[in-house]
From Swiss-Prot:
Keywords: Calcium, Cytoplasmic vesicle, Disulfide bond, Exocytosis, Membrane, Metal-binding, Phosphoprotein, Repeat, Transmembrane, Transmembrane helix
Lineage: Eukaryota, Metazoa, Chordata, Craniata, Vertebrata
Residues that bind Ca(2+) 3: 322, 325, 328
Provenance organism: Pongo abelii
Localisation: Cytoplasmic vesicle, Secretory vesicle membrane
GO MF annotations, alphabetized: calcium ion binding; calcium-dependent phospholipid binding; clathrin binding; phosphatidylinositol-4,5-bisphosphate binding; phosphatidylserine binding; protein heterodimerization activity; protein homodimerization activity; SNARE binding
Sequence positions bearing Phosphothreonine: 136
Residue ranges of the region described as Cysteine motif: 13-35
Residues the record lists as binding Ca(2+) 1: 262, 268, 320-322
Binding-site residues, Ca(2+) 2: 262, 320, 322, 328
C2 domain boundaries: 231-352, 363-496
InterPro entries in the record: C2_dom, C2_domain_sf, Synaptotagmin
Name of the protein in question: Synaptotagmin-10
């Protein structure tokens, strides 16, 4: 019985203690009444939490202070370091001329700072200042410029490496006939005090715009050229673009006031057309007999896309037909801008002046050939590859072309070779090699004259056009020859335009005197 009573008392005590705990910690009873029951536990909990909060706050404050100190030191170093480092420049400006004789000075200028460092090495015999000036840096103060000029005048020394290849006696005349080659021996490389001053003064003007370099000088030159061109009539034609079929429709109406080419005081004119740069597609009108004001009224169509018209040129050539000789070119009309009159959506009428034909304007065709020279064997090989767009010399509108190559020396023909004849074509293909024996000592004295001939079984053969290559040639002919001499044993190929024969005596007949090339010496 006593045992059961003790268990009941203990359970009642535990329940009472549980109820008191809930009442105290739930806030339903004031804490002052409960402090006698739980004094030690609650106080220890509040003290420990307060200590943890204070220590954590101290750590955070210490870390922030350290970070602030590091940032402050970095900002101070950034702001004060350039000012402190630039102090030697102003202090050494006044003493720069006096310190030159004792130690060499190195001057550097960048986009942000200028430095003068004096090396404490013993003085050398020749003082060579190294100056590096940035084009984008601010202007140098006047004191520094004055000091630098005085220093450069006294001790500047220019070093220039001149590499001039030693020339052999074989190429003396070759170099003498090159007007484009600069004579290195005639150039004055001496540098005195005045060029140094000018160089120092011009460094400050780098980057400035010079209006005199942008003057339009082409206006006057074009006006003078237009005055020199002679007018030999007018040509009337119309232009329209067919958007559905992508065709440029050209209608040649008439020509007025053409010059007389026949003995009777008239001409037999016709017009030939190209849409440049394509020369394969061409059109030609009918020939109108004995008239200076022909009425053509013929329409032609060029297949071309509309977006390509801005890159095309319309070329008209007016010819005088001759039954027994080659046709004479009266003049030409070149329409550089097809949209000059309108957008070609409607038919536009155009009147253009016919410019008289010149030697350069006459389209006789082109020839392609290669040159190759073997100096050890003394052998030159000219390979005639092909021709294109040759002038029609026969009544049928074609030609029977062959190529004749002559080895010339001071106007005298030494040797000649020719290719086979290609029948009824204006674009012959040959691929035939012609070989001449020319020793190295005579290469500078000879040249080659290439003539495209039209074979005629009944009469005499006519010259379609000629071109020349050699040191005495002009333009592409000389450049082709020089390139052959520069690259031995390598075939050099170029297209050459054909020109009218200026005179038979100067190109194919024997004139003057020239020693024949010596045969190559056998080992």
């Amino acid at each position: 019985m006593s045992f059961h009573k003790e268990d009941g008392v203990n359970s009642l005590c535990q329940k009472a203690l549980h109820i008191v705990t809930e009442l105290c910690f739930a806030g339903q009873v004031e804490w002052e009444k409960c402090s006698g029951i739980f004094p030690r536990d609650r106080g220890s909990q509040g003290g420990s939490s307060t200590d943890i909060s204070v220590s954590l706050l101290a750590v955070v404050v210490s870390f922030c202070g350290l970070a602030l100190l590091v940032v402050s030191l970095f900002v101070f170093w950034k702001l004060c370091w350039p000012c402190w480092k630039s102090k030697p420049v102003t202090s050494n400006i006044t003493t720069l001329p006096q310190s030159i004789s004792s130690a060499p000075t190195e001057v550097f200028e960048t986009e942000e700072k200028k430095e003068i460092k004096e090396n404490e090495k013993p003085a050398m015999k020749a003082i060579e200042p190294a100056i590096k000036i940035s084009h984008t840096s601010p202007d140098i103060p006047a004191e520094v410029q004055t000091a630098l000029k005085e220093h450069l005048i006294k001790h500047a020394r220019v070093q220039r490496q001149i590499t001039e290849p030693t020339s052999s006696s074989r190429h003396n005349s070759f170099r003498r006939h090159l007007p484009r080659q600069m004579q290195v021996s005639s150039v004055d490389f001496s540098m005195g005090t005045e060029p140094v001053l000018q160089r120092g003064e011009t460094t400050t003007s780098i980057g400035r715009i010079k209006p005199e370099l942008y003057k339009q000088k082409s206006v006057d030159s074009e006006g003078n050229q237009k005055e020199d061109v002679k007018i030999c009539g007018k040509l009337n034609f119309t232009l329209q673009y067919d958007y559905e079929n992508e065709l440029l429709v050209v209608k040649i109406i008439k020509a007025l006031d053409l010059p007389a080419k026949d003995f009777t005081g008239t001409s037999d004119p016709y017009v030939k057309m190209y849409l440049l740069p394509d020369r394969k597609k061409k059109f030609q009108t009918r020939v109108h007999r004995k008239t200076l004001n022909p009425l053509f009224d013929e329409t032609f169509q060029f297949p071309v896309a509309y977006d390509q018209l801005s890159n095309r040129k319309l070329h008209f050539s007016v010819y005088d037909f001759d039954r027994f000789s080659r046709h004479d070119m009266i003049g030409e009309v070149i329409l550089d801008n097809l949209f000059e009159v309108s957008d070609l959506s409607r038919e536009a009428t155009v009147w253009k002046d016919i410019h008289c034909a010149t030697t350069e304007s006459i389209d006789l065709g082109e020839i392609m050939f290669s040159l190759c020279y073997l100096p050890t064997a003394g052998r030159m090989t000219l390979t005639v590859i092909k021709c294109r767009n040759l002038k029609a010399m026969d009544i049928t509108g074609s030609s029977d072309p062959y190529v004749k190559v002559s080895l010339m020396c001071e106007g005298r023909r030494l040797k000649k070779r020719k290719t086979t004849t290609k029948k009824n074509t204006l674009n012959p293909v040959y691929n035939e090699a012609i070989i001449f024996d020319i020793p190295p000592e005579n290469v500078d004295q000879v040249s080659l004259s290439i003539a495209v001939m039209d074979y005629d079984r009944v009469g005499h053969n006519e010259v379609i056009g000629v071109c020349r290559t050699g040191l005495d040639a002009e333009g592409l002919g000389r450049d082709h020859w020089n390139e052959m001499l520069a690259y031995h044993r390598k075939p050099i190929t170029h297209w050459h335009p054909l020109l009218e024969l200026p005179g038979r005596a100067t190109s194919f007949d024997s004139q003057g005197s020239c020693p024949s090339p010596k045969p190559p010496s056998t080992p």
